[in-house]
Amino acid sequence: MNNLLIEIGAEEIPAGYILPALTSFCDRVTAALTGARINHGKTAVFGTPRRLALMVEDVQACQAPQKTTLMGPPQRIGFDNEGKPTLAGVKFAEKAGIVPEEIIITDNGKGPYLSAVIEESCLLTEAILEGVLPELIQAIPFPKSMHWGDLDVTFARPIVSLTALLGKTVLNFKIGNIASASFVFGHSFMAPERFELESADAYLDTLRKAGVVADIGERRTILKESIKAAADKACATIIEDEELVDIVNNLVEYPYPVVGHFDEVFLELPDEVLITAMREHQKYFALADTAGKLMPCFIAVNNTRARDMDVVAKGHGKVIRARLADAQFFYHVDLESTLDDFVEKLKAVTFQASLGSMYEKTGRLVVLVEFLAGLVNADQELQKKLMRAARLSKADLVSQMVIEFTKLQGIIGRVYAQKGGEDPEVAMAIEEHYRPVYSGGDLPRTDTGKILAIADKTDTLCGCFSANLIPTGASDPYALRRQSIGILQIMLEAGFDFSLRALVRRGVAQYQTDPDKKNEISTQILEFLKGRMTNMLVDQGFSREAVNAALSVSFYNVPDAFLRIKALDILRQEPDFEPLSTAFKRVVNILKKAGGDAKTRVNVNLFNCDAEKALHQACGEVTERVDTCIKAGDYGAALKEISTLRPHVDRLFEDVMVMDDDVALRINRMALLSSVAALFRNIADFSQI
C-alpha cells in the first residue's frame, strides 16, 4: 500500500479560507475512497497561502472485492418441469453474466427463486482517483470563488499547479489548462522553481528545503517561537492573541518576524485602540513591558527574509504610523462630543429594517432593565446605574472610532464613559453588555453589565422573532442562538432565579400588542431557549435524558433547572436507578391511561390492604422532608428521599389491582399514586428517562 498526496497550488488564498477548505477536501476525498471500497489509513492536511494539500496513508492499490446477490424470477418460471432453463431463466443468466448452470435456487421466504452471486470487478485505485479528483477539487467550498481567463473553472484563487501521487505513481488528470504532475513549487520568493518529488512521502521534506513549512501545526510552533525570540530581544512581552497567531500563520509559508517602532505620542490612545489598529489593519503583534504597559513597538511577520531586515522594520513603522495618526484624529474628534450627544444621533442608525432605529432599541432597553431590576430586587443605586447604562449602551456606535474599528463597539463606549465621568460600573457595563461575544467567551462581571446584557439579548431575540427573522438550519444572521445561550449562561452564573417566561413576555410586549400574537411569539421564543439550554447542558456533559426529563417539568427558573438536572444526572449513575425509574414510570403510565391525576384526596377509610396504608404513610413522611430539601435547592437529597418510596410502590403493584372494578377503590388508588407522582414531578418527568 502507498500514501496518496494531492496538492493544489494556487495564487494567494485568504487566510480564513485555508482550514475550512482543507477540512472539506479531506472529508470529500475520504468519503470518495470509502464509497469506492478503497481501504486507507490516517489522513493529514497541509496548507499555506499558496497551497492546499492532503496526505492519505496506506491507500489500497485497488477496490476491495464485493459480491452481490441478484434475485431473478420464481423457479417455476425459470425452469420447466424437466429442470431445463426456460427463456426467462436464460435471460436471467445473461443479465447476471453467468451460464444457466451457475444459477442458484434460493428460498427468499416467498418460495424458491432464481438467484446469482455476482462478484464485481475490482478497479485500480489509480483509475478511480483520476476520474473523481477534478470534481472533488472543484467542489471545495469557499466564501467567494473566482473565474480566471476563459476557463470554465472556479476556485478561491487561480490554480497554478496540481500535484497528485499515489506512492511514486503520478495520477493523471486536468483542471482547466493545468495538468497534474509530480513536482511542487517552492517558496514563491526565495525558491520559486519546481522541485520534483520522488514519491508522496517526500512532500514535506522537499518543501522544507524549498523554504516552505507546509505542516500548519509545525509552522505555528515556529511562528510562536520566533516572535517570542524577537520580543525577548526587544526586552518586551507579546500581548497574547492566539487568534492573531492563527491568522498570521496562514499568511506566510515561513515566518520571518521583525520588530518595528512608532512614535511615543500615539501612546496617549487607549490600549484597545492601539492594539486593534495594529491587529485589524496590519496583523501586527502589540508589545508591552514587564509591567504590562504598551510599548511604542510591535512585531510584524513577513513571508520572506530580506537582505536588510532593518529596512523592512522601518517600512512597517511607516505604515502603522499612518494608521495610528488616523485613529488619533478620530479619537480627538469623538472627545469633542459627549455620549449623550451620540445617543441623539442613534435615531439615524437602523437596528433592523423591520425593528426601527438604534435609538428606539435604546428606549426598549431602558424599559427592560427597569423590569429586570424589579425581578432581581435591585436596590435604588443599582436601578440608577441600570437606567443610565441602558441609555448609553449603544451611543458609541456613531463614534468615529467605532465606524473605523467596528470591533471596538462597547469597548470605546466604556473608555468615553470613563473620560466623561460616568460611574465606573456604568462604564464597564457599556462594554460588558455585548458579552459573551463568542461561544465560550467571558461573561459580564458587574451586576449592571449582567442585567443589561440579558436585556439587550432579550430585546434582539424578541424583535427578530416578532419580525419572523427566525434561525433556520445553519442560517442565523442575527446570532440568535449565541445570544440565547448568552442569556442562559449569565442567568446561571449569576444565580438569577427570576422567571424567564416573564422576561420574554415583557420583551415581546414592546413589539406586539395583540394578545394572541404575543402569546404565540412568546411560546416560540421560550421553546427556542429551551432547545438552546438542552444543547448547552448536553455539551457540558449532562445526559440528554436527564436534561429533557428536568426541563420538561419547567425551565423558566434557569438556576433551579440546572440544580435539578445535576441531581438527576448523579442519581442516574446509581446502580439501583433503573428499577427506581421503572417503578416511577409505571406510576406515570397508569395515571396517563386513566386520564391524568386523580381530582380527589386519598380516603384512608377505603384502604383494604397493608400495601396501600404503608405507601400512604411513607408518602406523607417523605413529602414533608422533600419540601424542605426543595426549598433549600438540594434536589439530590430530595431525590434520595423520594427513592425510599420505591419498595412501597413495588409492593403496591404486587399486592393490589390499581384499576379495580370497584370505582371508589380505583379512584382512591389513583389518588394515592397521584400523591407519589406529585413528589417527583416537581423535579423531573421520569417517563422521559
Swiss-Prot record:
Localization per record: Cytoplasm
Coiled-coil annotated spans: none
One of the protein's GO biological processes: arginyl-tRNA aminoacylation
Domain of life: Bacteria
Keywords: Aminoacyl-tRNA synthetase, ATP-binding, Cytoplasm, Ligase, Nucleotide-binding, Protein biosynthesis
GO molecular function, one term: arginine-tRNA ligase activity
EC supergroup of this enzyme: ligase
Reaction it catalyzes: tRNA(Gly) + glycine + ATP = glycyl-tRNA(Gly) + AMP + diphosphate
EC code(s) of this entry: 6.1.1.14
Entry-linked NCBIfam families: glyS
Assembly behavior: Tetramer of two alpha and two beta subunits.
Family of this protein: Belongs to the class-II aminoacyl-tRNA synthetase family.
Protein's UniProt name: Glycine--tRNA ligase beta subunit
Naturally occurring in which organism (per UniProt): Desulforapulum autotrophicum (strain ATCC 43914 / DSM 3382 / VKM B-1955 / HRM2) (Desulfobacterium autotrophicum)
Gene responsible for this protein: glyS
